[in-house]
Amino acid sequence: MTYKYDFLVIGAGIAGMSYALKVAQAKKGKVCIICKTTLDEANTRFAQGGVASVTNLEKDDFEKHINDTMIAGDYISDPAAVRQVVTKAPEQIRQLVEWGTQFDKQANGQFDLHREGGHSEFRILHHADDTGAEIQRALMAAVRANPDIDVKENHFAVEIITQHHLGARVTRRTPFIYCYGAYVLNTENRVDTYLSK
C-alpha cells in the first residue's frame, strides 16, 4: 500500500517527536512518525539528570555557559555549535514547557535549578531524577493530541527512497541525494511505501 504525507519522521525519540510537533503546529502539512516499537519505548525516557539552560539572567549568562561547555569539552567542541545550542536553549525549554513538560519548581514558582559537574552556576532544569521520562511523557501526549500527526507503531523503516529508486545513478560522490520517502515493514509483515515531500 502507498501512503502520502507532507513529512515523514523516522524515529520517535525527542528529536523525532519535537520535529513532528513543530511542523504540525506550524500548519506545514500532515506528518507521519514511523516508530519501530511503541511510542513510549524511545530511549529518551532513560535520560535522568536534566537539561542545561540559562534561565536566571540575574545570576547567569550565555557567556558563562558557553565557557563552561568549552572547558568541559577540553576546547575541542565547535565554538559556533556550542554558542548556538546555549543561546537557543531557553527557547527550547519554553517549547518543552508549552508541550506539557513539568520541570520541578520551587515554592515561589521559579525553576528548581541544580548545579552539576562542569557548570559554574545553577542552570540544570530537571523533573526529579527522571527528566527524560517526563519530557517523553509530555511529547507523547502532545503528539497523540495533534490531529495532523499520525503515528505508525511497530513499523520498521527498511529503506529510504532516493533518486536511485527512480533510475538515477547515485554514488558516494553524488552532490545531492534527495529523500522521497521510505519503504516500511508493517505489522502484517508487508512492505508499504510512504512518500513525503
Question: Where would I find each of the regions flagged by the language model?
Answer:
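Core beta-strand elements of the Rossmann-like FAD/NAD(P) dinucleotide-binding domain
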Residues: 2-5, 189-197
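N-terminal Rossmann-like FAD-binding beta1-loop-alpha1 element of flavoenzymes
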Residues: 7-33
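Conserved structured core elements
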Residues: 17, 90, 133, 193-196
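A generic local structural motif
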Residues: 18, 186-190
